[in-house]
């Protein structure tokens, strides 16, 4: 028994003219001026740190990592600009006191990493470090406690406690900075942690599974590899650097093939929205300091950094001194809760300040006084395997062919059927899966007679890309089941074979469902979620749909050898 569904997608974009080049010196001044002005506004709003205010500029400061993020931003600004005072405050003393807030609160993970980075921003010798010297002996003890990664890493089990795998990279950086500064002198503890953190890479993997063994691959693999590299580099672990080098080269090439022209990083996974724009300064900053991993000329990467900065600047509400994180139509994963609005905004300051000097210094050192406003991104059509095994394979199809630009991941999500991890063309202009929703976004959900809903996702049983990268074939005989934990795949008697093709400027998805024995399907459903606000209803009657906006159009034609009913639902 077989059933076939075909979907053809076409994209049209309307392009506007832009300036040609950016002056390096002008951008250096522009960013530093912005940071000084906005950090001063936030700092001036704090009347006392004892007790710390629960709101600043009208938004909560109680979200996870909030104070650690802010102190890192102040410290990075101090090192970037050489300024030791801001808004009438001594920055070293202020950062020192904020660290005590995080220490007393028992804060962990990124709060600890940001504390370690903040301390190092004021110097690598504690005898002359202005922050450290501003602390009393009791306060120094509290800071030492704050910089102990055992708050979330258990050396007995060699695992992080109730956190994703990539947090081993966070623990490694905290421990390496602590060792570098003399906060800790336990080299055996450090090396054991580094060896454990790097194990996926030392075993020969190019990409890290963030929830082993389920096969969850996303932007955290890139961050994880960078963090371990920086930790190993800090304490001279050349053996680990040699093992991680192939991964970083592959991951940076993939990032360059995935990233959007406007500076948006990874289009799939749990880092949607502003987080993916904030990735770009960090990655470009790393590449500015580590030329061996650059996938493109520095001038083009600087242009990408400029695009991300330009987006974030225009997204910033100068009257409120906050990013527009919760504006209408914005989607964020649940970890970016309402009480982290301030934290995400000051995180923007910190990531910008920390990366900006590295990028500007590299440009000036290499004699690049101007660079393009828009990066030259290469055409690409290829499949990158994250994992290739007889049991279950995973990877991503990256396409940048004219107006067809997307990343189609075949990987495991945080839940079966999670929209952001489905094998759909994420980043395709006009198409956008709803963030962190179990929803059939160009990936069908099949409801069986027994009530189970199954989805062809969470890796695949077979992945077969064509040699030219313009066709991708995948097969599922074991299905993800909505409501079960990730990785709990089931053979329900159905086989799905999907073929994606790029032909004549269009993307075609053809799916064949088959079974060896009769199977009752209660419902088959698929949605085409779009960011475009208008729709041509007349076309819908003819088995097609056109989404329209001032940015362009998204045309979708569909058909099947079984009856299909189409409806339109608008959010508002």
Map each language-model feature to its residues.
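Non-catalytic all-alpha helical scaffold/repeat segments
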Residues: 24, 28, 32-53, 62, ...
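Hydrophobic h-region of N-terminal signal peptides that target proteins for export
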Residues: 10-18, 59, 71
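Extracytoplasmic/secreted proteins, especially bacterial periplasmic and envelope-associated proteins
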Residues: 34, 69, 170, 220, ...
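Extended polysaccharide-engagement surfaces of secreted carbohydrate-active enzymes
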Residues: 261, 265-268, 275-563
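Boundary at the C-terminal end of the N-terminal hydrophobic targeting segment
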Residues: 17-21, 25
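Short, low-complexity, charge-dense intrinsically disordered segments
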Residues: 3-10
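Aromatic-lined, polymer-binding surfaces characteristic
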Residues: 57-284
């Amino acid at each position: 028994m077989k059933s076939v569904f075909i979907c053809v997608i076409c994209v049209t974009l309307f392009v506007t003219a832009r300036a040609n080049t950016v002056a390096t010196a002008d951008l250096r001044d522009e960013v530093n001026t912005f940071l000084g002005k906005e950090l001063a506004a936030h700092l001036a709003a704090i009347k006392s740190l004892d007790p710390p205010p629960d709101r600043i500029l009208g938004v909560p400061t109680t979200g996870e990592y909030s104070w650690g993020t802010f102190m890192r931003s102040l410290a990075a600004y101090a090192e970037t600009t050489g300024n030791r005072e801001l808004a009438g405050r001594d920055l070293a003393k202020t950062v020192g006191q904020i660290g005590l807030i995080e220490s007393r609160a028992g804060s962990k993970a990124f709060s600890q990493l940001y504390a370690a980075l903040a301390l190092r921003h004021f110097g690598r010798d504690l005898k002359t470090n202005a922050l450290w010297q501003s602390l009393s002996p009791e306060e120094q003890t509290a800071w030492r406690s704050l910089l102990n990664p055992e708050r979330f890493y258990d050396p007995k089990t060699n695992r992080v406690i109730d956190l994703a795998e990539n947090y081993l990279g966070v623990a490694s950086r905290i421990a390496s900075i602590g060792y570098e500064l003399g906060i800790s002198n336990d080299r055996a503890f450090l090396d054991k942690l580094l060896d454990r953190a790097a194990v996926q890479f030392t075993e020969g993997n190019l990409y890290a599974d963030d929830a082993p063994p389920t096969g969850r691959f996303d932007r955290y693999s890139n961050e994880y590899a960078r963090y371990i590299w920086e930790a190993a580099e800090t304490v001279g672990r050349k053996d680990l650097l040699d093992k991680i080098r192939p991964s970083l080269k592959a991951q940076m090439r993939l990032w360059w093939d995935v990233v959007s022209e406007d500076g948006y990083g990874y289009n799939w996974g749990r880092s949607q929205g502003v987080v993916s724009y904030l990735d770009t300064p960090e990655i470009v900053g790393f590449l500015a300091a580590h030329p061996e991993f650059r996938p493109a000329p520095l001038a083009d990467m600087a242009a990408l950094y400029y695009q991300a900065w330009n987006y974030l600047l225009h997204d910033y509400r100068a009257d409120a001194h906050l990013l527009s994180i919760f504006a209408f139509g914005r989607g964020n994963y649940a970890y970016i809760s309402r009480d982290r609005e301030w934290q995400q905004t000051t995180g923007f300051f910190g990531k910008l300040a920390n990366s900006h000097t590295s990028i500007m210094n590299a440009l000036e050192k290499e004699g690049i006084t101007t660079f393009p406003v828009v990066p030259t991104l290469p055409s690409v059509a290829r499949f990158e395997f994250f994992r290739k095994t007889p049991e279950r394979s995973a990877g991503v199809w990256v396409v940048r062919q004219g107006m067809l630009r997307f990343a189609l991941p075949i990987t495991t999500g945080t839940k079966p059927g999670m929209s952001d991890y489905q094998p759909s063309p994420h980043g395709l202009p006009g198409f956008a899966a709803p963030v962190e929703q179990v929803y059939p976004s160009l990936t069908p959900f099949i409801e069986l007679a027994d009530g189970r809903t199954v989805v062809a996702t969470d890796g695949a049983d077979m992945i077969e890309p064509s040699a030219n990268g313009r066709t991708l074939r995948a097969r599922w005989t074991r299905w993800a089941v909505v409501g079960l934990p990730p990785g709990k795949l089931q053979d329900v008697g159905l086989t799905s074979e999907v073929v994606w093709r790029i032909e004549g400027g269009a993307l075609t998805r053809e799916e064949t469902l088959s079974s060896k024995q009769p199977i009752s399907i209660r419902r088959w459903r698929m949605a085409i979620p779009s960011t475009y606000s208008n729709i041509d209803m007349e076309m819908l009657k003819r088995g097609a749909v056109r989404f329209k906006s001032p940015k362009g159009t998204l045309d979708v034609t569909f058909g099947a050898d079984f009856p299909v009913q189409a409806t339109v639902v608008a959010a508002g």
